[in-house]
Regions:
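A polyanion-binding, active-site-adjacent surface
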Residues: 1-251
Length: 251
């Protein structure tokens, strides 16, 4: 799988107590044989307009793959725990497959585990995680009713951006998790999550305020909670994005 080069758009590193600045990566799967288009359809005229639509290859094409044979989220987590497809396995304390409801209406996707997540094996448990929990509760969604995960399932060294091969190794796990949960809406947190999920080079700013599609599922893009810790003025636009997701859930 070929992944395009990293962009230079400034961003913030998730998963850190005092997140340093970094470049938001253009970390996307090759669009072939999947397909990205701009033909998504807005479900309601009072919601933002359509954005990208990405449809990775059908799972039927990979039926012999152990990941596709995983029948439950626990099965996927077991495969992740045994994964050695990239060098991230060499420095991890724990894999972080994700957690939450197996029948969640909302799937939340971040970039990758930070130090606390690596230590605990759970996603979004540091300061950024506390903020995410509050955001979800503000739209009457207890954390336990949501499925929360990341693009990569192991912590990159020094909380650096995930590299191309690392994302490519982890995307099949994410795809299978989404297939099993069958959410009504996906919330992508930060540029890496949005670009990787939608297979696009577009910046985070250009992806906001649109309703994208991943295999037909509406995708809303917003800032990563770690970015909000350093840039409180982004909280208002983030809240606007989250309310779009809430309206889609209620639609």
């Amino acid at each position: 799988m070929i992944l395009p080069p990293i962009s230079s758009t400034p961003g913030l590193r998730p998963g850190s107590e005092n997140p340093p600045r970094h470049a938001v990566g253009v970390l996307t799967p090759d669009a072939s044989p999947g397909k990205t288009s701009t033909a998504a359809k807005s479900p309601s005229s009072d919601l933002p307009g359509p954005g990208l639509s990405f449809d990775p290859p059908s799972a039927d094409l990979f039926a012999a793959d152990p990941i596709q044979r995983a029948a439950t989220l626990a099965d996927v987590a077991t495969l992740i725990a045994d994964c050695q497809k990239c060098k991230l396995c060499e420095g991890r304390t724990n894999t972080v497959p994700g957690e939450g409801s197996a029948t969640a209406r909302l799937v939340v996707i971040g970039e990758g585990p930070g130090r606390t997540e690596d230590e605990t094996g759970r996603p979004f448990v540091g300061r950024a995680g506390e903020l995410l929990t509050k955001i979800l509760e503000a739209i009457q969604l207890p954390r336990a009713q949501v499925f929360i995960c990341n693009i990569v399932k192991c912590r990159p060294p020094e909380n650096r951006l995930p590299q191309y091969d690392e994302i490519a190794a982890c995307l099949p796990f994410l795809y299978r998790q989404i297939e099993l949960v069958k959410p009504k809406v996906i919330l992508a947190l930060g540029g890496t999550a949005a670009q990787s999920l939608l297979s696009t080079k577009q910046s985070l700013g250009s992806l906001r305020n649109q309703i994208h599609r991943f295999r037909g599922i509406p995708v809303v893009v917003t800032y990563h909670p770690a970015a909000l810790l350093r840039n409180p003025h982004w909280k208002r636009p983030t809240w606007d994005d989250v309310r779009i997701a809430a309206r889609l859930l209620d639609d």
